[in-house]
Curated annotation (Swiss-Prot):
Belongs to the FtsZ family. Its main location: cytoplasm. This is FtsZ-like protein. The gene is ftsZ-like. It comes from Magnetospirillum gryphiswaldense (strain DSM 6361 / JCM 21280 / NBRC 15271 / MSR-1). InterPro entries: Cell_div_FtsZ, Cell_div_FtsZ_CS, FtsZ/CetZ, FtsZ_C, Tub_FtsZ_C, Tubulin/FtsZ-like_C, Tubulin/FtsZ_2-layer-sand-dom, Tubulin/FtsZ_GTPase_sf. This bacteria makes up to 60 cubo-octahedral magnetosomes of about 45 nm in diameter which contain membrane-bound crystals of magnetite (Fe(3)O(4)).
Length: 323
């Protein structure tokens, strides 16, 4: 349905890498991007886009794009999605210039406010129309934020899911499943951001890092293109049986609710370990996940090395086409 953008060459021309961009839209999206940058994820470019000039000034992103200077004057969208939408439309040429030769774009935003709810669908549609593999990763409000904000969020999600290839939804209310009475507000949101972080890392590691089994970008596109709703999960474990424990943690992410990977049409599995990781362990982890999905699911599998993980294994799963 959509064309594939040409892939850019690395400076030394010895290998080809896809250009992957994460765009944080609005305040929550900008915070998620900052947390990803601080985690030092490799092989990704970052863009922050916001109607709030003050918040944009605090971004750590490679590129910062003010949205709707004429319609918002840099003062934000004031919880009005229609203003966020107009702001994105005003600045869409700046967005398209920044992502013009990208192969994959993750768009992250908080749903329920003005900028994220209004601007994210506009940006997603523009990216996808350019043939860019477009993934949305968004949060839904806490219950205590009220019915009006939740209604705004649900309307924005309904719009967004029609203009992205794959959409991951993280209900903030589910943070209570993993938070304790001592968990700070900042740390709680970092937990939600880790879903985005692990999902992006599971893709980039497979095409950037050396490993037993590497994937090319075409494999990833097959699993994530035009797939609708998805879930992401990452598990890390040490000790025996670390492979199985990591796999089970990856497919039981409490932040994503009660959604199961059982009905997934496509599954991307990334198994990462140190140089002590054995072929038997890779087989164990992959088979543990495979037993959870339908026999006809399209499973794309890769395994990479990370010297920092000696003694540990990390399993990441992206399951797409969730009913």
């Amino acid at each position: 349905m959509f064309g594939v953008e040409p892939i850019s060459f690395c400076e030394d021309m010895t290998m080809i890498r896809p250009r992957i961009i994460v765009i944080g839209v609005g305040g929550a999206g900008g915070n998620a991007v900052n947390n990803m940058i601080l985690s030092k994820i490799e092989g990704v470019e970052f863009i922050a886009a916001n109607t709030d000039a003050q918040a944009l000034g605090l971004s750590l992103a490679d590129r910062r794009i003010p949205l709707g200077g004429y319609v918002t004057k840099g003062l934000g969208a004031g919880s009005r999605p229609e203003l966020g939408r107009s702001a994105a439309q005003e600045s869409i040429d700046d967005i398209l210039t920044a992502i013009d030769d990208a192969n994959m774009v993750f768009i992250t935003a908080g749903m329920g406010g003005g900028t994220g709810s209004g601007a994210a669908p506009v940006i997603a549609q523009a990216a996808r129309e350019r043939g860019i593999l477009t993934i949305g990763v968004v949060t839904k409000p806490f219950h205590f934020e009220g019915g009006h904000r939740m209604g705004t969020a649900e309307a924005a999600i309904e719009e967004l899911q029609h203009v992205v290839d794959t959409l991951i939804i993280i209900p903030n209310q589910n943070l209570f499943r993993i938070a304790s009475e001592r968990t700070t507000f900042i740390d709680a949101f970092k937990m939600a951001d880790n879903v985005l972080n692990s999902g992006v890392r599971s893709v980039t590691d497979l095409v950037v890092k050396p490993g037993l089994i590497n994937l090319d970008f075409a494999d990833i596109r097959i699993v994530m293109s035009e797939m609708g709703k998805a879930i992401m999960g990452t598990g890390e474990a040490e000790g025996e049986p670390r492979a199985v424990k990591a796999a089970e943690a990856a497919i039981s992410n409490p932040l994503l609710g009660d959604t199961s990977i059982a009905g997934a049409k496509g599954v991307l599995i990334n198994i990462t370990g140190g140089m002590d990781m054995t072929l038997f362990e890779v087989d164990e982890a992959a088979n543990r996940i495979r037993t959870e999905v339908a026999p006809d699911a399209n499973i794309i599998f890769g395994s990479t090395f990370d010297e920092k993980l000696d003694g540990k294994m990390r399993v990441s799963v992206v399951a797409t086409g969730i009913a």
